[in-house]
């Protein structure tokens, strides 16, 4: 049996109180000991919140909207995922980052408590993209159907129960979005919403450029908006994850880029499930100024 065969569909493994993908949890010291540099740019999200979208936008901003430069490699190489480790299948994120020249763009889904201390010490710029929890739950469910390094999700009903309890990889969505929101008061952190990026991409991309000290003309902004639209990215083999082996991600079960819309949750949530989610939301999010849009029309 190859080293890669024993990580598929394994139960999550607890790391300092957080459920983590089994393959990623092996040799966790590599994460704790990771050394950042002050020029590192960290893209941080809860899973299925537009991470790849934001990664391509940031890469384009740093390259002044030059589409050809952004075609230099696949997204998983341009923007390595810090915690990624699938023995025998992929070079680990940490190993890839050692070879990546500065300024590095680093992707992670880690909760604040698990992020290597060196990112805080170096005051690395971070961009957090938050997406409403109902759409995240639906997207995460479909992702777990096709992503073999995650446990099988079971039925939608079973999965939603796990999601609401935080018994999914990276833990509670509620805790994740809330703790990163609070962190922006003490760290150079730009906090963005998926729904706002969807509704007014140029405005949000301007915020990203400003945060990264980049000045872009209107033509460059328009190129970025066009190149990073869902329709373009879904068909772009450099960013749609079709470059990964089918053993790891089976797009016949569900494409990595499925719909990319706001409000798809309405096609899955029953009235009872909506009430259940809203009750948990009210309890977990009390006292925070965070506000989420669950329907683009209401934005």
From Swiss-Prot:
Liver specific. It is found in: Cytoplasm. It is an enzyme of class 2 (transferase). Substrate binds at residues 107-109. One of its GO terms (molecular function) is sulfotransferase activity. Its EC number is 2.8.2.1. Keywords: Cytoplasm, Transferase. One of its GO terms (biological process) is 3'-phosphoadenosine 5'-phosphosulfate metabolic process. The active site is at residue 109. GO terms for cellular component: cytosol. InterPro entries: P-loop_NTPase, Sulfotransferase_dom. It holds the Pfam family Sulfotransfer_1. 3'-phosphoadenylyl sulfate binds at residues 48-53, 131, 139, 194, 228-233, 258-260. Transmembrane segments: none annotated. Coiled coil: none annotated. It catalyses: a phenol + 3'-phosphoadenylyl sulfate = an aryl sulfate + adenosine 3',5'-bisphosphate + H(+); 3,3',5-triiodo-L-thyronine + 3'-phosphoadenylyl sulfate = 3,3',5-triiodo-L-thyronine sulfate + adenosine 3',5'-bisphosphate + H(+); 3,3',5'-triiodo-L-thyronine + 3'-phosphoadenylyl sulfate = 3,3',5'-triiodo-L-thyronine sulfate + adenosine 3',5'-bisphosphate + H(+); 3,3'-diiodo-L-thyronine + 3'-phosphoadenylyl sulfate = 3,3'-diiodo-L-thyronine sulfate + adenosine 3',5'-bisphosphate + H(+). PANTHER family: SULFOTRANSFERASE SULT. Belongs to the sulfotransferase 1 family. Sulfotransferase that utilizes 3'-phospho-5'-adenylyl sulfate (PAPS) as sulfonate donor to catalyze the sulfate conjugation of dopamine, small phenols such as 1-naphthol and p-nitrophenol and thyroid hormones, including 3,3'-diiodothyronine, triidothyronine (T3) and reverse triiodothyronine (rT3). May play a role in gut microbiota-host metabolic interaction. O-sulfonates 4-ethylphenol (4-EP), a dietary tyrosine-derived metabolite produced by gut bacteria. This is Sulfotransferase 1B1. It comes from Mus musculus. The lineage of its organism: Eukaryota, Metazoa, Chordata, Craniata, Vertebrata. The gene is Sult1b1.
């Amino acid at each position: 049996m190859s080293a890669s065969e024993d990580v598929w569909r394994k139960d999550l493994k607890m790391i300092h109180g957080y459920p983590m993908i089994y393959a990623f949890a092996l040799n966790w010291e590599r994460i704790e000991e990771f050394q950042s540099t002050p020029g590192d740019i960290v893209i941080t999200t809860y899973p299925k919140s537009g991470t790849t979208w934001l990664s391509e936008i940031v890469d384009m901003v740093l390259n002044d909207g030059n589409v050809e430069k952004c075609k230099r490699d696949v997204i998983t190489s341009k923007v390595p995922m810090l915690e990624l480790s699938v023995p025998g299948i992929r070079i680990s994120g940490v190993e890839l980052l050692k070879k990546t020249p500065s300024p590095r763009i680093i992707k992670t889904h880690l909760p604040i408590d698990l992020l290597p201390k060196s990112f805080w010490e170096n005051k690395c710029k971070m961009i957090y993209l938050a997406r409403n929890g109902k759409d995240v739950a639906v997207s995460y469910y479909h992702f777990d159907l096709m992503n073999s390094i995650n446990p099988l999700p079971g039925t939608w009903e079973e999965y939603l129960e796990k999601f609401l309890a935080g018994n999914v990889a990276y833990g509670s969505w509620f805790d994740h979005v809330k703790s990163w929101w609070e962190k922006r008061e003490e760290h150079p952190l730009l906090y963005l919403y998926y729904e706002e990026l969807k509704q007014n991409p140029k405005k949000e991309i301007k915020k990203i450029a400003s945060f990264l000290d980049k000045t872009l003309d209107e033509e460059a902004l328009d190129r970025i908006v066009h190149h990073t639209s869902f329709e373009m990215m879904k068909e772009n083999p450099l960013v749609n994850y079709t470059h990964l082996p089918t053993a790891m991600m089976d797009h016949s079960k569900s494409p990595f880029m499925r719909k990319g819309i706001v409000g798809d949750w309405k096609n899955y949530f029953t009235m009872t499930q909506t009430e259940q989610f809203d009750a948990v939301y009210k309890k977990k999010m009390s006292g925070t100024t965070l506000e989420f849009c669950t329907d683009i029309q209401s934005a």
